[in-house]
Amino acid sequence: MSKKLVTEEMRTQWLPVLEKKSEQIQPLTAENVSVRLLQNQAEWNAKNLGESEGPSSVNANVGKWQPVLIDMAKRLAPNNIAMDFFGVQPLAGPDGQIFALRARQGVGDASNTQQSRKELFMEEAQTNYSGDQTTVHSGDPSGFSQADIEGSGTEVSSYGKAMDTVKAEQLGSPTQPWARVGITIQKATVTAKSRGLYADYSHELRQDMMAIHGEDVDAILSDVMVTEIQAEMNREFIRTMNFTAVRFKKFGTNGVVDVAADVSGRWALEKWKYLVFMLEVEANGVGVDTRRGKANRVLCSPNVASALAMAGMLDYSPALNVQAQLAVDPTGQTFAGVLSNGMRVYIDPYAVAEYITLAYKGATALDAGIYFAPYVPLEMYRTQGETTFAPRMAFKTRYGIAANPFVQIPANQDPQVYVTEDGIAKDTNVYFRKGLIKNLY
């Protein structure tokens, strides 16, 4: 009697495993990021503000800054464009570490170091490495010959195969060594840096503002300083993205796309719609370069967003599935809408040049091209002038910023040595891709 391929005993044993849902690894969500920031803020408040609770009702009507700062910190985080484009990793101290774990062929020996070995998973898998190494792996990754692709040429594609039983039985012998793999864990540091603003005012201004306008100068100046710090941070992050992004590779010349020459279409509307195909191709290129995923964020000038909206490609109300006109407001929020291919579109409200920058951000806070590492959202200082006794106040914030470790840390970096630079260099970060748009209209 022939042996049954699948028995009832096998089904009883393995069906519960097959039917059980895999437990998902919970990522660091935006909510958790805010929780960590508020905790940092509360710890700073307790250590530095010196506000005591006071006995019973003695201080019942004494104003306190702790709840005010908590509210400001809560408002600050969601308005930060880094929350949409960067990975966010709150710091628990003034310095932090980030790591790049790279899988590699082989291990270090007397003739080479482990970090010099070829990295796995970033390129096509070498088909003969774990199999028969006497077979050749070369040519086009998909197996096409040069004649297939170009119409002429003699180069053919060859690929590795699995080893036969005789060679497999000899694995580990001097003539048939195992193909080996290993890992390197390379490390870099990120340090919190600061921004700060200061303001002072007279007692007379405080009294008159309250008497005539019913306004609290403390609250007004606090709001001004926090808003200015937030605006400067957003501009830093936008400029950082555009500075470090690589240029478009498939369209245009050296990252400059001329709509009149490089984009297909009979009139403006068709060309604006073709822009979406262009974005899709370049977004796929981000996925190829990073091996993480295709670009899913767009940062562009207001006029580019308006062109996409006029072409009917932006859905401002995706929950209702309604194609609505998009009113791009350069003075309003940076979020503009959702492209028909699912990409979220944000505008650079101060852009003069017409441009598009694509970015990839994954489902977790570790999966992005740049890391934003906030430490203390807001530090507040209050004092009085030494001769005028006029009120003075200042705000500071502390945060770090660094490129993804796979961008920041060179592939051949010695694992025993820390990288102390932030990895923000011109045209180097493959998680972002930029293009200037000429002759948009």
Swiss-Prot record:
Compartments (UniProt record): Virion
Major localization class: virion
Claim: Repeat is one of the keywords in the record: no
Record keyword rRNA-binding present: no
Pfam families: Gp23
InterPro entries cross-referenced by the UniProt entry: Gp23/Gp24_T4-like
A single GO cellular-component term on record: viral capsid
Superkingdom of origin: Viruses
Positions of the pro-segment in this chain: 1-51
Protein's name in the database: Major capsid protein
Keywords (A to Z) from UniProt: Capsid protein, Virion
